[in-house]
């Protein structure tokens, strides 16, 4: 396909989803089954309104059954499923349309997702796309019966280990996904939707207490310092604001945010997307709070020249202001998080520093209610 978007000054090629691949393979299989012919390409309409002309491969014909594949192209998106082959096996049924997952397609084991527990992880929009192409082909050939469709993915079980599926409780393979049929490179929307899906799963287990960490540093610190497992919460990446929004929308009452100062300090400036491309402000935020705590002009100048928050904390330590400044920042973080949540949830924060130290030796600061919330989360973990 030749669809492009411009992002961060670069022209990036779009791709197509596993859902589009599945629908295309099904359409090709149905055409070859009903038309008693062989085709090497097929056109499918996507929900986004873009028509795709996709190549068909691995054609295997039997008397009443056709199997074929479509290779996914994720464009310029760094997608682990790029290049995967999605297969469809199509055969006739008397009336209904049955869509099932075969080898390499995940199986849902936890509630809260768009597919029911026990079902193949083929999401509603791809299922609808499959039904629409079958209806189209049936009308073309005057066919009044039904179809059995089995979708599979080459090496799907191995590839799935690199996706969010294990954390979502989807086992044995990848998911057939896509709401638009098109992959936009580095799509923030796709990342946020993944976080939402993970929250949906976790709140079916517990929506009273919730752990949020931006990434692996926070996850490891939470586990090794406090015994808190991210299974009781989510990794939110840079999307702290969107995560808080969705947690509050789902009536989560108590949220504990644990992360490194380099990311969390930005929240003290009201920055809710902490990616450096969106905003930085680390030096400015630390410098402002250092000034409030009585730092010298030389100290503030040194902070403004620093490259990392760990370097800043060394400067503050030498000035005798490390604790005061970090606590001041922490209170402002809590203020902005409460404001974002419209004061509808109790939010506590743990912020740690010194990435070069061993986990057990890292300095950390916490808001007044964080210790009690950690205890409650530990109790919930014991129940689970």
Curated annotation (Swiss-Prot):
SS bond list: none
UniProt catalytic activity: Co-precorrin-5B + S-adenosyl-L-methionine = Co-precorrin-6A + S-adenosyl-L-homocysteine
Keywords, comma-separated and alphabetical: Cobalamin biosynthesis, Methyltransferase, S-adenosyl-L-methionine, Transferase
GO molecular function, one term: cobalt-precorrin-5B C1-methyltransferase activity
Pfam families: CbiD (PF01888)
The protein's annotated pathway: Cofactor biosynthesis; adenosylcobalamin biosynthesis; cob(II)yrinate a,c-diamide from sirohydrochlorin (anaerobic route): step 6/10
Stored SUPFAM superfamilies: CbiD-like
E.C. designation(s): 2.1.1.195
Domain of life the protein comes from: Bacteria
One GO BP annotation of this record: methylation
Catalytic EC class: transferase
PANTHER family listed in its UniProt record: COBALT-PRECORRIN-5B C(1)-METHYLTRANSFERASE
Alphabetized NCBIfam families for the sequence: cbiD (TIGR00312)
Similarity remark: Belongs to the CbiD family.
The protein's name in its UniProt record: Cobalt-precorrin-5B C(1)-methyltransferase
Organism per entry: Ruminiclostridium cellulolyticum (strain ATCC 35319 / DSM 5812 / JCM 6584 / H10)
């Amino acid at each position: 396909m030749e669809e492009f978007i411009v992002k961060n000054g670069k022209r990036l090629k779009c791709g197509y989803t596993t859902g589009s691949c599945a629908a295309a393979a099904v359409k090709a299989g149905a055409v070859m089954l009903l038309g008693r012919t062989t085709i090497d390409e097929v056109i499918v309409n996507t929900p986004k309104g873009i028509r795709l002309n996709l190549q068909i491969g691995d054609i295997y014909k039997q008397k009443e059954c056709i199997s074929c594949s479509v290779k996914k192209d994720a464009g310029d998106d760094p997608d682990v499923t790029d290049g995967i082959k999605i297969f469809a096996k199509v055969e006739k049924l008397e009336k209904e349309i049955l869509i099932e997952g075969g080898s390499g397609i995940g199986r849902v084991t936890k509630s809260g997702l768009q597919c029911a527990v026990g079902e193949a992880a083929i999401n509603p929009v791809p299922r609808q796309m499959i039904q629409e192409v079958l209806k189209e082909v049936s009308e073309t050939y005057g066919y009044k019966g039904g179809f059995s469709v089995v979708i599979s993915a080459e090496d799907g079980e191995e590839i799935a280990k690199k996706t969010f599926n294990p954390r979502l409780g989807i086992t044995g393979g990848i998911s057939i996904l896509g709401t638009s049929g098109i992959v936009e490179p580095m799509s923030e929307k796709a990342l946020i939707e993944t976080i939402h899906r993970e929250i949906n799963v976790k709140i079916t287990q517990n929506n009273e207490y919730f752990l949020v960490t931006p990434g692996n540093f926070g996850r490891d610190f939470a586990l090794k310092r406090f015994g808190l497992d991210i299974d009781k919460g989510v990794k939110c990446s840079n999307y702290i604001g969107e995560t808080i929004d969705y947690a509050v929308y789902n009536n989560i009452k108590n949220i504990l945010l644990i992360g490194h100062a380099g990311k969390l300090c930005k929240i003290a400036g009201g920055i809710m997307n902490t990616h450096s491309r969106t905003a930085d402000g680390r030096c400015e935020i630390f410098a402002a709070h250092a000034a409030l705590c009585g730092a010298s002009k030389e100290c503030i100048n040194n902070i403004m020249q620093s490259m990392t928050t760990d370097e800043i904390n060394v400067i503050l330590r030498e000035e005798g202001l490390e604790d005061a400044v970090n606590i001041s920042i922490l209170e402002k973080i809590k203020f902005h998080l409460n404001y974002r949540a419209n004061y509808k949830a109790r939010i506590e924060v743990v912020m740690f520093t010194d990435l070069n130290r061993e986990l057990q030796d890292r300095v950390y600061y916490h808001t007044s209610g964080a210790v009690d919330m950690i205890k409650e989360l530990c109790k919930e973990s014991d129940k689970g």
